């Protein structure tokens, strides 16, 4: 042990030790019992103390315990700028505590503990008010977090819990200028505004008014040319419209006709295209700015449309099964009633005369055997208040068309089943006296100035081939050129047989449009029995060229788009007319008559097959000499005009280059002179 450890303070007065033990803290020991401390205290009273000295005195902490010294290992910081009195005060204080006497508290609590190390004095700065506030906040927050709220821990009962839909979970941040608050079913997609919906229906007049617009996207249609326009998405249709420099392209695709859709790349490089596939082919839209948003909306509407279609078919099948079971039950009840009536009648006859009873018993099997031969079937007939007349069959076996129109390069627009006989549908569409359907159909295509619709007349003296002609004005939406064109229509009835099929070909010529004198649009209408009580309408078209044209592809695409739009309009108008003029009825069918009808139909179909085949329609037939010469001269004149324009541009550029060279030469001469 060193000398420092054995060192103890020595005082002239013996009571000083006891006083030290009683006071305990070194301040009291130094101020009351130590002579040196008294001297220093007197010197302190003589030195004037300022406020800074008082603050330092308050912040002085003396640590005599070893554990406390370990916890606060700070050094003594001296301010060199203090006054002489302040420095002497510190030196006196330090010298008074060099004795390193352990505190009485430590001696009393741990008598056997080793002697403590020398005391350490630290200068601790008092925390500011800001730090105190922050620490108080942390303490209060920690206390609150530990306590918690009992209301947050209580779970809601099962009756209160509700399942939120994705649309409710998603923030409602739609554009109020472009959309309304109403949503499409339970999806997060909003309907378009009233003005946007109105503008859409003005562009696509064949789309039903109740088919509301959801949204539109800027894109391009990939055909022979790239048509830049807008793709409109409604509840049931995909509609594309383009009108650039007079070239119009319109496409209408029903979602129920879509078989496949996918996101693809344009030209194999840019992932900004969407491919739509139907039974008629594939359509490619590219150049989408927001392809994912457009594809998501298409997929959502397509899935909802297919779901509604499946549910409707299931409901129809369920109703058919119920009606079939009810019919079987009614037939069984009626047969039982008839048998009971026959038995009662036979019993009465037995009581009257035995001979008559024998004859009745002999004839009864014949009468009972004939009852199952007749059956009641559902059919469709014209209403009593209908303006149309039809006296043909309303119940028949299904038939077929004689040839496939696709072999003649025709494009099938629609195949539509209707709840009526083929003859009823033919009378509604091509009746000579009642033309309400035809007038509504033409006006729906923006037709006006319709001439009087004449009756069909015979062409070659036979009643099988009939023809009629009329014309009307159709509005055009070209930015330049004529605002309307005259359409000359010629309708020819090729076949009119209520037992097999109907065939009508409509030819339309529009000479006022570009290359209008070189082509005509042919539309074929075929109607046959789809089953015993319904019919099937097939609409197809092709373009018949009588001359050549350098815009042939554009003309055919324009005709196709117009025909597709007209087919949509025709389907809607026909459904309305059939609903207003046709009703359901019950008829009695005999098996013998049915078998006889089958034989007659087979014979007629054989006769149709033995007939000469129809003329194959060639899309680009040979050009007549005079017409070909005229077309060739027009083409050469057009080419000559282009060459002349190019030569003029060339001369202009040559002259401008010569003027520029002349000016450069002048500038060089001026520089040489200078």
UniProtKB/Swiss-Prot annotation:
It is found in: Endoplasmic reticulum membrane. One of its GO terms (molecular function) is sterol transfer activity. The keyword Endoplasmic reticulum applies. The chain crosses the membrane at residues 634-654. The keyword Phosphoprotein applies. PROSITE patterns: VAST. Gene3D superfamilies: Pleckstrin-homology domain (PH domain)/Phosphotyrosine-binding domain (PTB). Residues 82-119, 358-371 have a biased composition (Low complexity). InterPro entries: Cholesterol_transport, GRAM, PH-like_dom_sf, VASt. Keywords: Endoplasmic reticulum, Membrane, Phosphoprotein, Transmembrane, Transmembrane helix. Residues 409-582 form the VASt domain. GO terms for biological process: intracellular sterol transport. Residues 198-264 form the GRAM domain. Residues 1-52, 65-151, 336-380 are annotated as: Disordered. Residues 69-81 have a biased composition (Basic and acidic residues). GO terms for cellular component: cortical endoplasmic reticulum; endoplasmic reticulum; endoplasmic reticulum membrane; endoplasmic reticulum-plasma membrane contact site; mitochondria-associated endoplasmic reticulum membrane contact site; mitochondrion; nucleus-vacuole junction; plasma membrane. The modification Phosphothreonine is found at residues 110, 143. Residues 336-357 have a biased composition (Acidic residues). The modification Phosphoserine is found at residues 113, 140, 149. May be involved in sterol transfer between intracellular membranes. Belongs to the YSP2 family. This is Membrane-anchored lipid-binding protein LAM5. It comes from Saccharomyces cerevisiae (strain ATCC 204508 / S288c) (Baker's yeast). The gene is LAM5.
